[in-house]
């Protein structure tokens, strides 16, 4: 009777997992407001799109501000609405209170603001993503950006060397080859929660932070603060 070492079997399995490669048109990293709109826009143009989130429970989550519209970002919501975006439609179905700000002043500064049912807003947006053709949701942490060093003349017409993105790699080693990568990481990159002198390394609302992608961005030459 011959016994096969478990360690060797596990290593072979891990090696096979690391070799898994999928090809898509666009990778969107992050599933907040920006990520959802970017992924939907790409998918609706017929591009095979995958959107990554550290947790499907955090899709369109609003841990800091449950309002849509208002003086600061109301114009962005209206622009998205004009371009076929989903944020304005979703808040119409999930708001619990709305108010016209600056109503006592001139119409130039009137600004509609709606307060969302956070749980319902997130649930409905997730449903929209799941039902969208050409769009797949992946619960995974993207750790590395993959790129090639190419001659800038071939990309922008300028002389010198530059980098051309070719995909991403997740924490489990799966590679997604893509023609474009859209970063919508929000406040998750090496996130910290400060409470007085106490520092907790965590993402918003106690969710997992993205602790590896920052290093990949730095390696690519992107300045990080």
Identify the role of each PLM range.
Residues 20-34:
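Beta1/beta-strand and adjacent pyrophosphate-binding region of the FAD-binding site
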Residues 22-24, 169-180:
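Core beta-strand elements of the Rossmann-like FAD/NAD(P) dinucleotide-binding domain
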Residues 146-174:
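Conserved beta-strand-loop-beta-strand element in the redox core of flavoprotein oxidoreductases
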Residues 40-147, 172, 184-201, 208-213, ...:
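Conserved N-terminal/central alpha/beta ligand/cofactor-binding core
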Residues 26, 48-50, 179-181:
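Beta-sheet entry/capping signal
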Residues 4-6, 12, 16-23:
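A short, basic/flexible loop-to-alpha-helix module at the beginning of a structural domain
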